[in-house]
């Protein structure tokens, strides 16, 4: 009988450790804590060598964007979150690029350089802060699973807001690219002229494994814990 209790105790400890590790993996991969407002004199550019070459350009694009006239917009997601965006009008009735940023990014940081490109092409731009990022509500990032439903909601909003004849291009980078690609198998309205997807990932599993490697853990070992954490929490 004592052996049985020992075995049960060991199993319970192992189960608790698995749940704890899964929770920590969930926090690192999916959880997005409440975000303080960025000070008006600060530009949110990540640290790291990958950004140094482009830091000055990114800061200039962000400052130029802040100086541009815009209209703040918001929608309510399917699960009750307030999602926010900013609309930059090139001209009345111009085609609109509906733009989505990357993993743990912000519309200002990832997309500000794209607004000038839109204007050069005669397009307006609606920059979206994805759920769990910047000014939008939410504490969970789902690598496009929920975000692509938000994309469809923004698309419906744009058609209602700008008229049934508005022309729309869905644009995204990184996780935002995968977000817009995930809607490509839906019955999209004829308003959608096309999709611009820059460096999207091939699947949620692949990008999660990449995130695990960036955290310094073996992807094949960490992925089951991340997957379990997503299901539990």
Indicate where each model-derived feature is located.
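Short beta-strand element of the alpha/beta-hydrolase
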Residues: 94-102
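Alpha/beta-hydrolase fold nucleophile elbow
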Residues: 162-174
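Alpha/beta-hydrolase active-site loop
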Residues: 141-162
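The serine-hydrolase catalytic nucleophile loop
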Residues: 103-117, 130
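Hydrolase active-site cap/lid region
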Residues: 182-233
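A short loop-to-beta-strand scaffold at the N-terminal edge of the catalytic core in hydrolase folds
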Residues: 78-89
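An N-terminal hydrophobic leader/cap segment in hydrolases
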Residues: 12-75
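Conserved alpha/beta-hydrolase
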Residues: 118-137
């Amino acid at each position: 009988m004592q052996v049985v209790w020992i075995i049960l105790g060991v199993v319970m400890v192992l189960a608790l450790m698995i749940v704890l590790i899964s929770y920590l993996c969930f926090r690192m991969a999916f959880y997005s804590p409440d975000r303080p407002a960025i000070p008006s004199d600060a530009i949110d550019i990540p640290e790291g060598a990958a950004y140094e070459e482009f830091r000055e350009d990114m800061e200039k694009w962000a400052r130029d964007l802040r100086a541009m006239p815009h209209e703040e917009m918001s929608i309510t997601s399917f699960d009750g979150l307030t999602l926010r965006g900013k609309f930059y009008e090139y001209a009345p009735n111009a085609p609109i690029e509906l733009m989505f940023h990357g993993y743990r990014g912000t519309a200002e940081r990832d997309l500000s350089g794209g607004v000038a490109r839109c204007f050069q092409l005669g397009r307006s731009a609606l920059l979206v802060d994805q759920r769990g990022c910047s000014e939008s509500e939410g504490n969970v990032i789902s690598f496009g699973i929920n975000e692509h439903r938000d994309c469809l909601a923004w698309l419906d909003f744009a058609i209602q807001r700008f008229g049934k004849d508005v022309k729309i291009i869905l644009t995204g980078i990184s996780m935002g690219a995968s977000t817009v690609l995930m809607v490509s198998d839906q019955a999209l309205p004829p308003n959608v002229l096309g999709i611009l997807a820059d460096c999207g990932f091939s699947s949620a599993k692949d990008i999660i494994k990449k995130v695990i490697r960036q955290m310094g853990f073996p992807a094949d070992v960490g992925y089951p814990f991340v997957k379990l954490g997503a299901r539990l929490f």
